[in-house]
């Protein structure tokens, strides 16, 4: 448990920040604490939103794949990120 906690950090983003994009290596999973982020597919087509208290980025970590969507902030946002690639629970 202490290994998990030492790898958790808070991160703040300004509106319009790209958190990750399609094809990026999967290095972090996130828990959105404040505001929302948009999910974009190829050609920047919006396919959804991630809201407060939702997790994102975990699928690519668990499947050991590159990012399949782009995530971008719509407002100034805050999240918790876990910096370990894979965790055993």
Task: Write out the residue ranges for each language-model feature.
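Regulatory nucleotide-sensing modules
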Residues: 1-40, 52
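Cyclic-nucleotide recognition modules
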Residues: 47-89
């Amino acid at each position: 448990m202490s290994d998990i906690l030492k790898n958790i950090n808070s991160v703040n983003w300004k509106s319009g920040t790209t958190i990750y994009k399609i094809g990026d290596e999967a290095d972090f999973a996130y828990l959105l604490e404040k505001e929302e982020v948009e999910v974009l597919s190829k050609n920047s087509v919006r396919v959804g939103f991630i809201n407060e208290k939702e997790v994102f980025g975990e699928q690519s970590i668990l499947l050991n794949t590159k990012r399949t969507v782009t995530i971008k902030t719509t407002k100034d946002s805050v999240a918790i990120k876990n910096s370990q690639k894979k965790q055993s629970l």
